[in-house]
UniProtKB/Swiss-Prot annotation:
Pfam families cross-referenced by the UniProt entry: HpcH_HpaI (PF03328)
Alphabetized UniProt keyword annotations: Hydrolase, Magnesium, Metal-binding
Entries under SUPFAM superfamilies matching the protein: Phosphoenolpyruvate/pyruvate domain
Residues that bind Mg(2+): E122, D148
Similarity annotation: Belongs to the HpcH/HpaI aldolase family.
Protein residues bound to substrate: R70, E122
Protein name (record): (3S)-malyl-CoA thioesterase
Keyword presence, Hydrolase: yes
A single GO molecular function term of this UniProt record: hydrolase activity
GO biological processes: oxaloacetate metabolic process
Cofactor: Mg(2+)
Signal peptide positions on this chain: none
Length: 285
């Protein structure tokens, strides 16, 4: 897991062209917001969305929510202008769509010298080049684009996301190898709470930091699933206490609830507590 001062349990897409949605997002319980200029904006609204979002970010207060701007691709007529407009914007990262190779980030890095870059991982080629992409020195985060990936694969939806497993795993490995944040793809049936919870739990158990969301109704479940539970926090504290006691007696392992606890378990326990503390600090802010 990447060491984070900021939680990314819930990462909500907001269309950059919708003034009311941009205003409403200021009061939502999202850890991060992706202000979208790409898929969520019609072609004839692209320029309007760019101007509206730029003004909004300059004037509106989004508190401690992490602000990500998803621009249009450099292969479109809007991509370069998007990057020039937001190169010095009040944003925390620029999200690049359809990153298939590390070279896709180079032109962006030159136009946006100061902001961190995030990559949409949503092409078959991107899956195969995930390690190369994750190694780019300007990259700090990855977002799974499972809808576009499913389209490329020609796969059908299954609750277990069998067709996605290889790509999800490759990107997770790459992100963890390079200390990046990585968030899971969207769940399209936003009124299906049971299905959303199951997919959030699957992503959490795989190792994702959080989930991208398409509707505010999904926030509560994502925040709950990707937060350490009281039982997990209690176990982490007991593991640390038991291991420290064992060390004082010259032992390298402890036993908690009939299970061996080694140093690697303590690393995980401390990460659990750090995540809980980061979430508590975010709520307090």
């Amino acid at each position: 897991m990447a060491h984070q001062a900021h939680p990314f349990r819930s990462v909500l897409y907001i269309p950059g062209s919708k003034e009311r949605a941009l205003e409403k997002a200021r009061g939502l319980a999202a850890d991060a917001i992706i202000f979208d200029l790409e898929d969520a904006v019609a072609h004839d609204e692209k320029i309007h969305a760019r101007r509206l979002l730029k003004t909004t970010l300059e004037t509106a207060d989004y508190g401690h929510r992490f602000r990500i701007v998803r621009v249009n691709g450099m292969d479109t007529e809007w991509g370069r202008a998007d990057l020039e407009a937001f190169a010095e914007a009040k944003a925390d990262a620029i999200l690049i769509p359809k990153v298939s190779r590390a070279a896709d980030l180079e032109a962006v890095a030159a136009l946006v010298p100061d902001l961190p870059l995030w990559a949409m991982m949503e092409t078959a080629q991107g899956m195969l080049n995930a390690a190369e992409i994750a190694a780019h020195p300007r990259l700090t985060g990855m977002v799974m684009g499972t809808n576009d990936l499913a389209k490329e694969l020609g796969s059908r939806y299954r609750p277990d996301r069998l067709a996605m497993q290889a790509g999800l795993g490759l990107c997770l490995l790459a992100a963890r190898a390079h200390g990046l944040t990585i968030v899971d793809g969207v769940y399209n049936a936003f009124r299906d709470e049971e299905g959303l919870r199951a997919e959030c739990e699957q992503g959490r158990d795989m190792g994702f930091d959080g989930k991208t969301l398409i509707h505010p109704a999904q926030l509560e479940i994502a925040n709950a699933v990707f937060s350490p539970s009281p039982a997990e926090i209690e176990l982490a504290n007991r593991q640390i206490a038991a291991f420290e006691e064992a060390e004082r007696h010259g032992q390298g392992v402890a036993v908690v609830d009939g299970k061996i606890v080694e140093n690697l378990h303590i690393v995980t326990a401390r990460q659990t507590l750090a995540k809980a503390e980061a979430i508590a600090a975010f709520r307090a802010s």
